[in-house]
């Protein structure tokens, strides 16, 4: 994958995250600033999602750990655990905020 393909895929991911948060009605604020997408919750905790263009990865920072995701077969997959990004993100949102956001189609 080249840089422009990576940026397009990451932008699509960010757009899906924002759309699904809106559709869910969850009390989750989000702000995109360049390659950084921040999700903030009522309890003032945050999840930080960041595009790492040189590595063609999307990174997710939670209260507990950092996760690195590679695009593989149409999904973003954690390079250590094998977890799928949107499934993990949904669980991380619930764990930090008790809000439910369903990222499935």
Swiss-Prot record:
Instruction: Give an example GO biological process.
Output: iron-sulfur cluster assembly
Q: Which domain of life is it from?
A: Bacteria
Q: Which Pfam families match?
A: Frataxin_Cyay
Q: Does the keyword Iron apply?
A: yes
Task: Give the matching SUPFAM superfamilies.
Answer: Frataxin/Nqo15-like
A molecular-function term among this protein's GO annotations: ferrous iron binding
GO CC annotation terms, alphabetical:
cytosol
Q: Write out the entry's keywords from A to Z.
A: Iron, Metal-binding
Signal peptide as annotated in the record: none
Tell me if Iron is a UniProt keyword of this record. Answer: yes
PANTHER family reported for this sequence: FRATAXIN (PTHR16821), FRATAXIN, MITOCHONDRIAL (PTHR16821:SF2)
Which HAMAP family does this one have? CyaY (MF_00142)
Q: Which NCBIfam families match?
A: FeS_CyaY (TIGR03421)
| Known function | Involved in iron-sulfur (Fe-S) cluster assembly. May act as a regulator of Fe-S biogenesis.
The name this protein goes by in its record: Iron-sulfur cluster assembly protein CyaY
Can you name the source organism?
Psychromonas ingrahamii (strain DSM 17664 / CCUG 51855 / 37)
Q: What is the lineage of its organism?
A: Bacteria, Pseudomonadati, Pseudomonadota, Gammaproteobacteria, Alteromonadales
Q: Which gene produces this protein? A: cyaY
């Amino acid at each position: 994958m080249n840089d422009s393909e990576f940026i397009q895929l990451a932008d699509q991911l960010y757009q899906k995250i924002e759309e699904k948060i809106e559709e869910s009605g969850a009390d989750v604020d989000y702000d995109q600033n360049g390659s950084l997408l921040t999700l903030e919750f009522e309890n003032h905790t945050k999840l930080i999602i960041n595009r790492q263009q040189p590595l063609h990865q999307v990174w997710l920072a939670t209260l507990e750990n950092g996760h690195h995701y590679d695009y593989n077969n149409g999904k973003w997959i954690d390079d250590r655990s094998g977890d799928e990004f949107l499934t993990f993100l949904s669980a991380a949102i619930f764990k930090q905020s008790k809000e439910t956001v369903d990222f499935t189609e």
